[in-house]
Design a protein with these regions (language model features):
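N-terminal and secondary-structure boundary signal
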Residues: 2-265
Length: 265
């Protein structure tokens, strides 16, 4: 028992995904760890050492005040040019450029960039969905300024409130270069490894693995996104239980392929 919270030892041989239902609409400045704990307690969810919380990027960004009113944006010459080429709002393009270090590809309706943390994605992850609009505002939502840092702060705050080490993954839906559709992807990680090096381990026939690295944070982020959904599901936080990996914490930045080994840029 830690500060009134129940602590159990995980003994599972299966992985469970438990949505934390009832998370309210998040506003700038909200205490997100506190909201998560109160909502989980209301649902009588007991925390277990080793639990992992997958949190949708959108509520992180809202709590951090990453909302921008497009009506206040003045597009640059470059944004006007790219806006014409892609047929995108040049004000949105201006924000995309501000959030990026490099334009990777563009064509009509598509603008793929590399953001300041090395993630390659469309529109720098800037989104309009599930944002309340009115005649005076034209809101868009940016990604957290530093998703790994956001995850670390939430991880630390959850520990201070519960006395339990909870892994934290911030996930977002990102498209893939070689396949159709978006996939839940880890953009911020704390308290667990984002990637596990399996090289040197033996396969079923005793052969050593030579190149295998498992992007476990992406796998967990994708699994949670099945419950979180993309529309009006209103389930932005999912608890993953039973995944036990006793290895050092590695942030989501560990998933970014170094430039010298990237064959496609």
């Amino acid at each position: 028992m830690a500060d009134g919270f129940c602590v159990k030892k995980a003994t599972f041989k299966e992985i469970k995904l438990i949505p934390i239902d009832g998370i309210p609409l998040v506003k700038p400045g909200d205490d997100l760890p506190g909201i998560i704990i109160r909502t989980a307690n209301a649902s009588k969810i007991e925390w277990i050492e080793g639990d992992i919380l997958v949190i949708a990027q959108k509520i992180i960004s809202k709590a951090e005040g990453r909302l921008v009113n497009l009506k206040e944006i003045n597009p640059s010459k470059r944004a006007l040019e790219l806006g014409s080429l892609t047929q995108k709002d040049p004000r949105l393009v201006e924000l995309i450029l501000q959030e990026s270090t490099k334009v990777i590809r563009h064509r009509k309706g598509v603008l793929v960039v590399q953001n300041h943390h090395g993630v390659i994605l469309a529109n720098a992850g800037i989104d309009r969905s599930n944002l309340e609009q009115d005649k005076e505002q034209d809101w868009v939502l940016l990604l957290p300024k530093d998703s790994d840092l956001s995850a670390k702060k939430i991880h630390q705050e959850l520990f201070s409130k519960t006395g339990i080490h909870l892994g934290v993954i911030i996930n977002d839906s990102i498209g893939r270069a070689w396949r159709n559709g978006t996939l839940g992807t880890a953009i911020g990680v704390a308290g667990i490894p984002s990637i596990i090096d399996l090289r040197g381990r033996k396969d079923l026939f005793g052969n050593p693995l030579r190149v295998s690295e498992e992007a476990i944070a992406d796998e967990l982020a994708s699994a949670a996104s099945l419950l979180q959904g993309q529309a009006d599901e209103a389930l932005p936080v999912v608890l993953i239980r039973g995944f036990q990996k006793q290895t050092p914490s590695i942030p989501a930045s560990g998933l970014i392929r170094p430039k010298e080994t990237d064959l496609f840029q």
